[in-house]
């Protein structure tokens, strides 16, 4: 009988010790999980050079996005562009082409914990395009004119990201823009499809929620 009582007592003691170790282990795991959940937000500006209908085109880019665990960005992007089409209209005037579009920005990121990252941005959105008068480089954009047309855009790309600091990230990359058909007099530009390449800067906080306590619980 004493043997069974001793065995039961030993089992109860072992169960209590195991339970205590499990709780401690659970706390330890939960503590370390904080280190793996990293968030970020940023504002980004960029400039790109490319072509529309074979003519030089300049782009300015703006982004605001949330970065989830250094693995994917989700936010809003906007692009304005000016294309030197030089379409002759009269002795002194030529027509160039301009527009703007914006929409959803999603950017999966590879090697997010490294100094250099590789990412695959894609933007899906809409905007408007217009022909503008170029009178010896005196650009005249008339917002009241009727010759505006809506355009829908899908723009995938490839970026190389350099983490300069916790607050600044540089990017360089290229992208290809697919657009809906444009039917706008004088019907020179049929769409705004084309490659562009350039660079940009992002300013924000890229690792909010990072665990700053490097010691294990057992070290304290």
Each model region followed by its residue ranges:
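Membrane-embedded beta-strand positions of outer-membrane beta-barrel proteins
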Residues: 43-45, 64, 76, 106, ...
């Amino acid at each position: 009988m004493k043997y069974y009582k001793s065995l039961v007592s030993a089992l109860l003691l072992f169960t209590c010790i195991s339970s205590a170790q499990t709780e401690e282990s659970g706390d330890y795991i939960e503590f370390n999980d904080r280190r793996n959940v990293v968030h970020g937000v940023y504002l980004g500006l960029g400039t790109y050079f490319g072509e529309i209908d074979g003519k030089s085109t300049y782009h300015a880019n703006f982004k605001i996005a949330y970065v989830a665990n250094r693995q994917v960005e989700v936010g809003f992007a906007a692009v304005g562009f000016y294309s030197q089409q030089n379409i002759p209209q009269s002795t002194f005037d030529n027509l160039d082409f301009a527009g703007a579009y914006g929409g959803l920005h999603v950017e999966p990121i590879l090697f997010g914990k490294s100094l250099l990252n590789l990412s695959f941005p894609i933007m899906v959105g809409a905007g408007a395009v217009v022909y503008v008068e170029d009178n010896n480089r005196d650009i005249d954009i008339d917002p009241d004119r009727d010759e505006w047309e809506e355009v829908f855009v899908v723009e995938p790309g490839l970026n190389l990201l350099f983490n300069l600091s916790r607050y600044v990230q540089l990017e360089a990359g290229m992208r290809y823009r697919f657009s809906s058909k444009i039917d706008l007099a004088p019907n020179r530009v049929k769409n705004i499809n084309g490659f562009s390449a350039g660079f940009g800067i992002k300013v924000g906080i890229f690792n909010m929620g990072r665990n700053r306590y490097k010691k294990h619980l057992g070290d304290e």
